[in-house]
Amino acid sequence: MKRKEGKKIKIVIGLGNPGKKYEKTRHNIGFIAVDNLRKKMNISDEREKFQALVSEKNIDGEKVIFFKPQTFMNLSGNSVIEIVNFYKLDPKKDIIVIYDDMDLSFGDIRIREKGSSGGHNGIKSIISHIGEEFIRIKCGIGAKEKDAVEHVLGEFNQTEQKDLDEILEKINNCVIEMLSVQNLDRIMQKYNKKKEKLK
């Protein structure tokens, strides 16, 4: 069923790679964050549609769709364009994308309204289909001096695991505020700062 006139829809997209092999890797922080949101909201049902795993919930009269492309990271845009076209979405207003960023320290998040891919292949794929103007939440996974591919496809180490719940809670709160508060500038000011030392 396509979007009805005046019906508000928001899509919260988490990027990652499908399959057990990747589910606990740093590159899958987008999937992990979306699953955490679904858990907090008691959303258990998930179905396959638009080459993605999809679930939804009505929040304050707005349909919110939680969306995990199953195309593998580099083809994420193929999945995203399907739901954008189906619901006739405006990417600038209706989409939030959560993904990993090696250029940010572990635990930092940055909100952006638009921009380039920054070398992230999932974002590059999405941009190729819908352009650069969509809100994204970049989640820092650090990189240090490690090989980039080895780092992003590696699992969180013990130190990172200890902090992960707190970081996911921060992402969760950020998304909830985005869905309920219209003042994105205020939200960006709140979250776009380096994390304090985690306890």
What residues fall within each predicted segment?
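Nucleotide and nucleotide-moiety/phosphate-recognizing core
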Residues: 2-113, 124, 128, 133, ...
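Extracellular serine-dependent O-acyl
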Residues: 139
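Short glycine-enriched, charge-decorated loop/helix-capping segments at active-site entrances
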Residues: 110-116, 153-157
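Hydrophobic alpha-helical segments within soluble ligand-binding/sensing domains
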Residues: 119-122
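The feature captures the short pre-catalytic strand/loop hairpin that immediately precedes
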Residues: 144-156
